[in-house]
């Protein structure tokens, strides 16, 4: 059961007895589970914890909610908040975190139609666009947020984006007709726009022609509102500003003085809103011979001039956002670019109130996407807001497919009487091609993904930016504060600006931030949250260089900044989008449903001659000469496949070499290939080998995430070096590369809208969750999954999702079709003794050494004699059996049993460690280095981060060089000559923890060493659990367990202490 569910159960208990946890503490824990690290506080950015909710009627018979809330960390001071009128319908519960907006000079807080605002889950930032779109249909807004990125690109969207950019550049420069024409041409030549034209199969000329139709309106608007002249000559409008002392509209002349910012990014922790304002303008309002200057939002629209409630609502919300940076603008502007018509949009209390209520309902729907009939019962997906009865709105809705699919698969409303009649037929029409098994697959994976995204580790929002000072957060290693800009900002291209920062005072702190990390840049001043997003380009002890999406040179030079790592662990938009695509009524989706959900048998071609071109036979034969028999068998199986092939890459069997050979053979045969994996490093490892064979390929993805030796093959670098500025040249680039490489998350690239590959190869497929792995498969006729389900599965944090089957990869799911499976069994990593462990535990003797040299290889210790002499200093240890056995190169495997030492574990602050094991690891590491083993050839593995930290600290204080200390997961796919494994757990109550119960992690740990493997732990504690019991049976039979004798325990501290002082 997840922690949040356990808390719900406890909260239901009426009497917990004397030892019961106080109810207030349970509510606080529930709040922490929903929003980790929230700090309760009063003031402008107040955060209150709801302790109790009572619904009652006032003296007039109207319903109101009485909330008992507290903002004190010790929860001793309780405050009453009364919600009246429409606010009483807000779905607030005990344990929720809320923000109260208004005046509370005397208690209680009273929030009603006329005064104050109530913000539910204020640390959940929701875009103003999403709130505005929920006006007509809340269901659509929830679906758009849930299936983010599934909205198809359109011609209108592209033209709108281009027009926005032309206007935004012009307002900072000039609206002269000839300059507008230049700006339009420049913008159309930007590679990012050329890519969208390619996606939509449009030409530059037709887009330019349409853009040019708007340009005269741009000039006219500027002539009306930005020219020089007396105030009486500026356009007159009706506008009310409460700060003038009147709420009535009265005529005034409007002069737009200048543009102050473009795409100003504002996050509001007061209102739980975020957004980017198209243009922030300085405006003079001339009325009755008086002038008032205001900084106001200007929203640009390229569609039909409707002055609709959605459009006006966006402007109202931007006025709320503007209050985070400056005084209340009280109104904003709505400009339709086609006509040049600009409308004033007053932001009155009523409009803001109703929009914030909508925002609360949207936040509640997004947060509570999983429900239970009762605490402790099985999770299920919550129903979405009701389907509306508005045929016209639904007809043009981009989420109609997902709406119908969710209704059928999750809400099971195929013939529900509650659905409007007009929509019932639409739901059936959208989903009639789907069978029950397809709907169940969709529903199950939606549930599992949602559970995973709502785990505490994935719930962390960005609230630390506004709730925790940078000086405090720096200790976590994920933030650097007190930064100032040092050099002029340089423009890489539109949307990419290079910024250099250094510490205002002192050197850079120790940090986990490194090149390639996503970051959010904010000002340390309260009003400057989330100014820009981007990546760390370069970082050292003196300075940090960042590539940001906005040019911040307009901010004062004295502005002090902070960088926060952007965590994106809980983002499920891509896998949910893939699931939605799998349910579409298209041929690729239908075929994948048959293979993956219905388990249709994969088909194969009978004769190799029918797929192997005559002129490629010699090339293929030469490539095959360098492969072993299982690898050659894999090549044949792939060439004969009509659907898919699974290649099982057992440890050390040359998986990367096999994939490289496969790509070369497919290329020689004239096939196009899409090469993917989950990580950039896995993709680049293959490409590094391909590059040595002079095989051409196109690498998609941002250059700074790609291996330095592969960057010259990226689309970004090629476009830059060739100065690509036309669609014809971009198409030529795409068409000239039959081999394309990207990660599984990069499948939204425009190239895939018009290109289908003959083969898709997915490396590390057994580590990728099914919906993520699906993405690239839509764009190929056949696919090859390479992996090993006996090694690490997809990482799943949520226990319930794991129990439902989320850790089953597509590789594992399809492995039941044995005709499609080829096993690589000849390995070139481990010597015979180390290999025998994995053969016994996992592979049923299938693994074999590739040569006698591999089988008999031992750890090279050129200075072993000197090391043994130095150990003579410790007379009691010089001839100890365990130490002699460990150091002996001809003993490749040994388990050091700590039962008699003793070596008890420590559990503190949720972390598990074992200091004695850590000290032993450091002692052994130091001894092997003295014996001549290079620090770079040694790897230390431990299952717990706390243990890793202790070992790393001890190594840092010793004379030992740079030795890699990491978890099993980080060592997947890699090896070292010497591996030392600390199992950590040593207790009498049988507690082992989830990590050590996973036999696949154990298998990975046992197969990382090439020449020597040293395991360290408590046999009595570990043997209770399979497969560790099986491991000990084998080790005992081979006499590979060495007991650390009790008589040596007394001297152990002395020896280890001396070791660290050396």
Swiss-Prot record:
SUPFAM superfamilies: P-loop containing nucleoside triphosphate hydrolases (SSF52540). It holds the Pfam family AAA_11. Acetylated by EP300, leading to stimulate the 5'-3' endonuclease, the 5'-3' helicase and DNA-dependent ATPase activities, possibly by increasing DNA substrate affinity. It is found in: Nucleus; Mitochondrion. GO terms for molecular function: 4 iron, 4 sulfur cluster binding; 5'-3' DNA helicase activity; 5'-flap endonuclease activity; ATP binding; ATP hydrolysis activity; DNA binding; metal ion binding; nuclease activity. Its main location: nucleus. Its EC number is 3.1.-.-, 3.6.4.12. One of its GO terms (cellular component) is chromosome, telomeric region. Belongs to the DNA2/NAM7 helicase family. This is DNA replication ATP-dependent helicase/nuclease DNA2. The lineage of its organism: Eukaryota, Metazoa, Chordata, Craniata, Vertebrata. The gene is Dna2.
């Amino acid at each position: 059961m997840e922690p949040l569910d356990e808390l719900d159960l406890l909260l239901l208990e009426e009497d917990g007895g004397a030892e019961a946890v106080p109810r207030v503490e349970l509510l606080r824990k529930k709040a922490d589970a929903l929003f980790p690290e929230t700090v309760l506080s009063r003031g402008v950015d107040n955060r209150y914890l709801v302790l109790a909710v009572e619904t009652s009627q006032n003296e007039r018979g109207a319903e109101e909610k009485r909330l008992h809330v507290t903002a004190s960390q010790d929860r001793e001071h309780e405050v009453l908040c009364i919600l009246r009128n429409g606010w009483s319908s807000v779905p607030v519960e005990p344990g929720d975190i809320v923000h109260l907006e208004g005046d509370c000079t005397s208690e209680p807080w009273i929030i009603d139609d006329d005064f104050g605002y109530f913000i539910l889950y204020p640390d959940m930032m929701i875009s103003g666009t999403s709130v505005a779109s929920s006006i007509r249909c809340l269901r659509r807004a929830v679906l758009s947020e849930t299936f983010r990125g599934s909205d198809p690109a359109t011609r209108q969207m592209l033209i709108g984006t281009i027009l926005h950019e032309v206007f935004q550049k012009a307002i900072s420069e000039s609206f002269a007709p000839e300059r507008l024409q230049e700006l339009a041409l420049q913008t159309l030549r930007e590679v990012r726009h050329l890519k969208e034209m390619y996606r939509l199969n449009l030409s530059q000329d037709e887009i330019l022609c349409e853009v040019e139709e708007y340009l005269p309106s741009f000039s006219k608007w500027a002539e009306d509102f930005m020219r020089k002249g007396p105030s009486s000559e500026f356009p007159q409008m009706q506008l009310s500003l409460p700060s003038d002392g009147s709420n009535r509209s009265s005529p005034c002349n409007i002069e737009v003085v200048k543009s102050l910012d473009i795409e100003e990014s504002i996050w509001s922790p007061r209102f739980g809103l975020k957004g980017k304002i198209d243009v922030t303008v300085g405006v003079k309002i001339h009325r009755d011979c008086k002038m008032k200057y205001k900084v106001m939002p200007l929203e640009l629209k390229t569609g039909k001039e409707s002055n609709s409630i959605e459009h006006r609502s966006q402007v109202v919300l931007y006025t709320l956002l503007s209050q985070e940076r400056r005084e209340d603008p009280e109104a904003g502007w709505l400009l339709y670019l086609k006509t040049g018509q600009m409308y004033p949009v007053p932001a009155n209390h009523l409009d803001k109130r109703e929009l914030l209520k909508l925002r609360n309902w949207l936040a509640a729907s997004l947060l509570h996407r999983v429900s239970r009939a009762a605490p402790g019962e099985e999770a299920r997906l919550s129903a979405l807001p009701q389907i509306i009865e508005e045929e016209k709105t639904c007809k043009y809705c981009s989420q109609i497919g997902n709406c119908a699919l969710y209704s059928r698969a999750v809400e099971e409303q195929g013939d529900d009487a509650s659905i409007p009649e007009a929509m019932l037929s639409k739901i059936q029409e959208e989903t009639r091609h789907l069978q029950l098994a397809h709907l169940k697959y969709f529903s199950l994976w939606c549930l599992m993904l949602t559970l995973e995204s709502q785990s505490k580790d994935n719930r962390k929002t960005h609230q630390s930016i506004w709730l925790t000072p940078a000086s405090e957060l720096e200790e976590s290693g994920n933030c650097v504060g007190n930064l100032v800009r040092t050099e002029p900002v340089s423009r890489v291209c539109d949307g990419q600006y290079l910024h250099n920062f250094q510490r205002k005072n002192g050197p850079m702190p120790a940090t986990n931030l490194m090149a390639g990390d996503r970051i959010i840049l904010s000002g340390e001043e309260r009003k400057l949250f989330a100014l820009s997003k981007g990546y760390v380009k370069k970082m050292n002890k003196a300075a940090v260089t960042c590539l940001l999406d906005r040019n911040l040179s307009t901010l004062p030079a004295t502005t002090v900044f902070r960088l926060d790592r952007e965590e994106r662990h809980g983002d499920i938009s891509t896998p949910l989008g893939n699931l939605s695509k799998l349910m579409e009524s298209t041929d690729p989706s239908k075929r994948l449903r048959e293979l993956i959900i219905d388990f249709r048998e994969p088909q194969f071609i009978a004769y190799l001659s029918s797929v192997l071109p005559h002129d490629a036979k010699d090339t293929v034969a030469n490539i095959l000469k360098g492969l072993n028999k299982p690898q050659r068998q894999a090549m044949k199986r792939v060439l004969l496949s009509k659907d898919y092939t699974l290649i099982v890459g057992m440890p050390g069997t040359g998986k990367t070499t096999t994939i490289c050979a496969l790509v070369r053979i497919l290329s020689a045969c004239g096939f196009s290939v899409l090469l993917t994996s989950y990580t950039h490093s896995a993709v680049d490892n293959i490409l590094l080998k391909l590059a040595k064979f002079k095989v051409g390929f196109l690498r998609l993805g941002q250059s700074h995430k790609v291996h330095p030796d592969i960057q010259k093959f990226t689309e970004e670098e090629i476009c830059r070096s060739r100065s690509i500025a036309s669609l014809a040249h971009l198409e030529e680039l795409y068409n000239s590369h039959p081999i394309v490489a990207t990660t599984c998350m990069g499948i939204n690239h425009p190239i895939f809208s018009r290109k289908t590959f003959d083969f898709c190869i997915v490396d590390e497929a057994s580590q990728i969750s099914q919906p993520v792995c699906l993405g690239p498969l839509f764009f190929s006729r056949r696919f090859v999954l390479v992996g090993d389900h006996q090694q690490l599965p997809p990482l799943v944090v949520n226990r319930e999702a794991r129990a439902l089957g989320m850790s089953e990869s597509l590789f594992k799911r399809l492995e039941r079709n044995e005709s499609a499976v080829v096993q690589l069994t000849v390995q070139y990593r481990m010597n015979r003794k180390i290999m025998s462990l994995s053969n016994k535990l996992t592979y049923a003797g299938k693994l074999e050494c590739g040569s006698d040299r591999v089988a008999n290889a031992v750890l090279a210790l050129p200075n072993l004699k000197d090391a043994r002499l130095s150990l003579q200093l410790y007379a009691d240890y010089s001839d100890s059996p365990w130490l002699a056995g460990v150091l002996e190169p001809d003993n490749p495997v040994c388990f050091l049993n700590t039962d008699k030492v003793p070596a008890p574990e420590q559990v503190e602050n949720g972390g598990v460690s074992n200091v004695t094991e850590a000290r032993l690891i450091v002692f052994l590491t130091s001894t092997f280095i003295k014996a001549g083993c290079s620090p770079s050839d040694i790897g230390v593995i431990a299952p717990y981060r706390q243990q890793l930290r202790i070992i790393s600290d001890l190594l840092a204080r010793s004379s030992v060089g740079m030795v890699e200390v990491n978890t099993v997961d980080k060592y997947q796919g890699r090896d070292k000559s010497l591996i030392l494994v600390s199992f950590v757990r040593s207790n009498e109550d049988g507690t082992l923890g989830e990590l050590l119960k996973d036999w696949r992690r154990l298998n990975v740990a046992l197969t990382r060493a090439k020449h020597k493997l040293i395991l360290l732990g408590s046999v009595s504690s570990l043997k209770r659990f399979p497969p560790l019991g099986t491991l000990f049976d084998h080790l005992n039979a081979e006499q590979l367990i060495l007991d650390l004798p009790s008589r040596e325990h007394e001297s152990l501290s002395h020896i280890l202490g001396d070791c660290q002082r050396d």
